[in-house]
Amino acid sequence: MKSILLLFLVLFSTSYYASAQSRAVTGKVTDTKGETLPGVSIKLKGTSIGATSGTDGRYTINVSGNNSILVVTYIGFVSQEVAVNNQTSLDIALTIDMQGLEEVVVVGFGTQKKVNLTGSVASVSSEQLEKRAVTKSSLALQGQMSGIQVRQGGGNPASNGASLVIRGQGTFSGAGTSPLVLVDGIEASLDLVDPNDIQSVSILKDAASAAIFGSKAANGVILVTTKKGIIGKPVFTYNSYIGKTEATMVPEMINSWEYAEVINQVFADAGAAKRYSDADIAKFKSGEDPVNFPNFDHIGNLFDSGNGISTRHDIGVRGGSEQTQYMFSLGYYNENGIITKNDANRYNIRVNLDTRLNNKLKFSLKMAGNLNKNSQPSGINGAGLGTIVGGAMRNANSIPGRMPDGFYGRNETLHPEADLESASFLQNNGTNFYTNGSVIWDIFKDLTITGQIGHTYGIEQSKAYVAKYAITPTYGNALNSLRENWSEGSALTLQTIAEYNKKIKDHTFYLLGGVSGQTFGGKGIGAFRDAFPNNSIYEINAGSTARGTQTGSSSRNTLQSYFGRFNYSFRNKYLFEANARYDGSSRFPQDSRWGLFPSLSAAWRISQESFFMDLKKGMPWLSDLKIRASWGQLGNQSVGNYPYQDLLSLAPVYPFGSALSAGAAITTLANKDITWETTTVKNVGFDLGLFNDKLSFSTDYFIKTTDDILYSVSVSNVLGATPGLTNAGSVENRGWDFNLNYRNVVGGFSYGVSAILSLIDNKVTKLSKVNQDIARGLFVGYPIGSAFGYKSNGLFGSNADVTGYPTQPFADQAQGGGIKYLDLSGPSGAPDGVVNATYDRVIIGKPLPTSTYALTLNGGFKNFDFNFMLQGEGGRNDQVNLGQFFFPLENNSNVQRDAYENRWTAANPNPNAAYPKLRNIASGFFNSNRVDFWYRDASFLRLKNAQIGYTLPKKIISRSGMSSLRLYVSGENLFTLSDFYKGWDPEMQTGGTAWYYPLSKLYVAGVSLKF
């Protein structure tokens, strides 16, 4: 008690002494022109004492002693530290922060001031990327910029990167929709760059900014700049985190006794005897006999079989002298999936070196390498996790897992536990090396020539091993096998660039010209063997050659390019830019090999006009205004090599006399006149800054049209060969990009809010000489990939409701609880009382989103910082494209709880039920025909990221030699709002070989230190 009293007296006396020595300091904060600045933060250095200037710019703050220092900060102005001395009145004038005006962004073959851009370019800095604890660099771009759709396709650690689409899907050909990615000017994969090595990412969205990349820029361009060395003593950094993943959404299946009751009900509806007795159902519920009457959750067992632990470590050093600067980094990443034996490992190294050889010559060298090792368990077909996930979706809880006798289930050919516990696996290993060297020659003040050479080399190896194992005493995989593939690819880039920059009074000119040559090559081999001695030997030469096969391939293509840029600026307010690239690709016939891709753009910085200065006197909150317009053309040559050549097959044999002789047959008739896909982009936009650019807003409207899409048209089978590609299609994307940013400081609290929104309308405008290609989801006037099917009007309430209704297309479904198909038209153009495929199918599904959006809130108070991001998509409706693995009881499949609880039943014959009547179909399907009944709104809003960090005070860490130590916790994909099917993630495109490996919800604890 005495100790507490003594401590109280000490604290009281200390505070009394401090208060006795304090005094008030008042003053006014203005800019250099004398204009008052409200909301300025004034803090007493080394304390938490602070004040904020009022609307008249005035402030009052209490200080103690004559050695006090005020720290004055205001967004858009240079921060100041002002000594108080013995003053009680202290006016402060802040200077505009020119760094904001001088902010540069990376563009094609150089940089430009952001305020002088005439095209549509979005950028994100390393500081923004570091706020995301992501596994792949592509995922860090989600929600950062408008105009780019970033969608993660699944949670498999071996393939959990994101697909990137800039301003809509521009083609439906094999040329693809992926943007061109350049890392330090050389083509590379974005996900093979460690996120910690990235300095900035720029997205070139319109033709004005991307035309200088010509025939590879139709889908947009992503420019990645890696970190460089710095002048000064070495700065060491270490970043690390440990994380735990779990599934975002998993469909819940019904219990075994509920499944038994459903089966009994559907049997009764069909007039058949029950499959399960009441005693059987009681045993399912009690769990007394888990072998014969189990309640085994196959999905839960599968997605909980892995530990889901991920770790990441990055170390780096940056430093250098005035002459030479260097950067070196090492990184390691490991992720264990939520499924056992499923993991990914990445090792990476990077060295960046910049040196000045003399006052005219500079040399830059960038080298990087990475090693990726991915593995996953495999099903009986050797295709990886697809069969295993499918089996878990399909098998009811009434089917046991591994039984005491070592076997699985009851005569089930798809048994995930058997596959998971077998020695089967799928492994993929990749090694990549990048070298990028350049020499910069400053010939004289305004003229620079750069020579650059870049080389990339990669090796990929895959092994798919299927073990010998038994599922039941009478069924299993009796023959083990191994399929192994090996491939290598390389690319060599040589380019020379000349730049001339000249300012004559109010006129600024910039000229760039260059020549580039690229060579791409690859080769691969593959082999298959089976009948290995046991499940422990899986080297290809240990298998039998009796059924063995071998494959081999090689390819090569080249691209020759000439490009240029012209910039003109008058008084930094009238801006003009022209770009052009002339490409020649070996992928096209000689007569159509070359293509010219030009662009023109202009901008008017209205804020630099004298009348704008006068306008600001009445509206001082108006700080910047610019309007922009551009037009240009881009190309797409990312098709297979030499598609203008006929393809031959050497397999056929022909009779000559009494013997068969080997021969050749044409299998593909090529079009000798094919050429580039050409994309024309028109863009108008404006940029607005308010309140000294604390609030900024920009918007763009664009029309992006792709013509001459390479497309294989349908022909009669009488031809006897597959037709080659022809330039026969067109697609249009129209849309808006919106960006809003606000930043402010209130007292000691700094915060920022950013919002992005992209609206887009995609449609096919031409399809050879037809209006639709149903099999490919192509319809003139509708988005790429549109679903074509029947319309419906709920369900039949009873069998009696079928009477008098138009004849249904599927007779066995025309009953109570069946989907009620609509009669829309007939031969005369009016409903004819019969629903059929010819007249009554229309567009029912839109797989492409019409909007993408994100809202980010970040800030800091004292040593704490935070970042929250909401992200989502809208305007898309879709179904779950997994057939029997989604539709209840079809082909003996499982039943989801959502369907169980919301289905039509005889006891509750709701014609508006979410699911139709359940029927047991041992082979085939009942209600899974393509109809709008199954299409749901796939829009969603997701808490994509949340991160909270704390930076330890320097006085605590200074003795350790560290200059900074930050601790943080972070989460990804934390929760989702959606009206899509329960348990199914709307961000994913399920179906095909991707199956359903749910996205990962990631919880992370990390540390970042610098010394």
What residue spans do the PLM features occupy?
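Glycine-rich, aromatic-lined ligand/substrate-binding cores of catalytic
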Residues: 847-880
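Acidic, glycine-rich flexible loop segments
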Residues: 274-297, 310-314, 382-418
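Short Gly/aromatic-enriched secondary-structure transition segments
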Residues: 252-254, 466-468, 527-530, 770, ...
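Extracellular/periplasmic, surface-exposed regions of secreted and cell-surface proteins
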Residues: 129, 177-178, 346, 352-361, ...
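Conserved small-residue
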Residues: 237-291, 726, 745-847, 887-890, ...
